[in-house]
A protein has these predicted regions:
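N-terminal type II signal-anchor transmembrane helix
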Residues: 10, 20-21
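Sec-dependent signal peptide recognition
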Residues: 2-9
């Protein structure tokens, strides 16, 4: 058998053939850093993406590739690095996933039935069957997460519409993007729904490493504490950001504060008290306010829209000046939330309209007492129902109020890791902006949309 190894950050061109023309018995593709002979990568090595290139800075002095993060502890050939790739902003992109599928005929360790297929019972016996079975992973870069209905919840599951006839109250199927394994010094909560907790974030990350190894990698035994800590030490030393954007140049030019190393120098202290508007103001590109380069001025204008533009938020549709992008993205220049809050940014009644054909749709009924607002008006009567593709935090707390709520993720290094949101439903940075206009009441002109995209692409 011939073994072909390559670096996924390289440009690959395939002309006139597909994997249907290849004999899988003759060629096995390897993306393992060990088999490539790479022991480490230098800090700030440029990794090309569609908008420029990103970089990773490690506090170890270089990005090690021979450690527990890249070791196999399970039974399905996976490592932490299977879903958290240095070339993809320490997660996976949908584009990368599709390329990997074509090059390996869907046999790379990323493609496993325990969480990669739309149902764990999916047929993966042929190439065409695998292409169908892994459709959510291929189209949205999402992994299937199975969670059962919580005990003593104040809601009940009324019905399940699952195209693959698997999801039930015992195990609902949710499809979520892997979160980046970098910039972790700025996260107060672990996992999209916060289900992994600990006395400290370090403890929570250790439990997450073990849970992922036993779940995603199908390890028969728990990781020992030393191994867990070694994985966490590696992760928490990684900082990832866009370094260079086409047409703009290096993102620390002329006094700007972009790039990864500036994140490593930033001290983040978590608090339940939301910082003042000035304290959470992003300032990466202040020096470009009066730049002679129009593209750099656009990045600055996008930053200021992010800092200052309010959205319609009260019952009368009036702008509330304190409700800007930084009201949720409170960690300055990282974009996470200092208080570890969970938000539903998509109007719940419209979730069904945004559903992928391969996603299950759930109908839930509220069984608790009527919920009223501060004025005593009933906002949620007993018996209210909703349809939703992912209940989010509600499956952890059992509380109706947490339906569709998710943590606030870091928004650095976005260019390397499309698609966006927890379910991969936004394909581009402009799609993100449009979603906030639709569901959160932001109002931007086309020029302002372009400025925001310029800003997000520079993060």
């Amino acid at each position: 058998m011939k073994k072909v190894s390559f670096i996924l950050g390289a440009l690959v061109s395939v002309s006139g053939c597909t994997t249907d023309d290849l004999n899988a018995d003759d060629v096995e593709l390897s993306t393992s850093s060990s088999e490539l002979g790479l022991r480490w990568l230098p800090n700030n090595l440029p990794i090309v993406n569609t908008l420029g290139f990103s970089e990773t800075f490690s506090t170890e002095g270089r990005v090690e590739l021979r450690n527990e993060f890249f070791d196999e502890f399970g039974t399905n050939d996976r490592t932490c690095g299977s879903c958290h790739k240095v070339t993809e902003g320490w997660t996976i992109s949908a584009a990368h996933t599709r390329l990997l599928f074509e090059l390996t005929r869907g046999r790379d360790p990323l493609f496993r039935t325990n969480d990669g297929t739309n149902s764990p019972n999916a047929d993966v016996s042929t190439l065409s069957a695998r292409r169908s079975a892994y459709s959510m992973l291929l189209s949205r870069g999402t992994i299937r997460v199975g969670i059962g209905m919580p005990a003593n919840a104040n809601f009940e599951l009324v019905s399940v519409d699952d195209p693959y006839n698997f999801a039930s109250a015992a195990e609902l199927s949710m499809f979520r993007r892997p979160l980046p394994a970098a910039n972790l010094t700025a996260i107060p909560t672990v996992m999209w729904d916060g289900r992994v907790t600990g006395a400290t974030i370090n403890d929570a990350l250790k439990d997450q490493a073990n849970g992922a190894t036993q779940g995603h990698a199908a390890a028969p035994n728990p990781l020992n504490d030393v191994t867990r800590q070694q994985i966490v030490d590696f992760e928490t030393g990684l900082f990832n950001a866009q370094a260079y954007t086409w047409g703009i140049g290096f993102l620390d030019a002329n006094g700007a504060g972009g790039r990864a190393e500036t994140l490593a120098a930033q001290n983040v202290e978590f608090t339940t008290v939301i910082p003042t508007r000035d304290a959470r103001r992003w300032n990466l590109f202040d020096s470009w306010q009066n730049s002679t380069d129009p593209d750099r001025r656009a990045v600055y204008r996008g930053q200021e829209l992010f800092n200052t533009r309010p959205h319609v938020n009260d019952a009368n549709g009036n702008p509330r000046p304190e409700f800007t992008c930084t009201n949720c993205h409170t960690v300055q220049n990282f974009g996470t939330d200092l208080a570890g809050r969970f938000f539903n940014i998509i109007d719940t009644p419209t979730v069904a309209l945004r559903r992928s054909p391969d996603q299950p749709l759930y109908t839930f009924r509220y069984t608790g007492p009527p919920i009223t607002n501060a004025g005593g008006v009933v906002t949620t009567p007993t018996g209210a129902t909703i349809q939703i593709t992912d209940p989010g935090r509600a499956l952890i707390t059992g509380q109706w109020r947490d339906m569709g709520r998710f943590k606030v993720p870091s928004i650095r290094g976005l260019a390397a890791r499309a698609p966006y949101f927890h379910d991969g439903s936004a394909n581009t940075l402009l799609d993100i902006v449009k979603a906030y206009e639709t569901f959160q009441g932001f109002v931007f002109t086309p020029e302002e949309e372009a400025d925001l995209v310029a800003f997000l692409s520079a993060l």
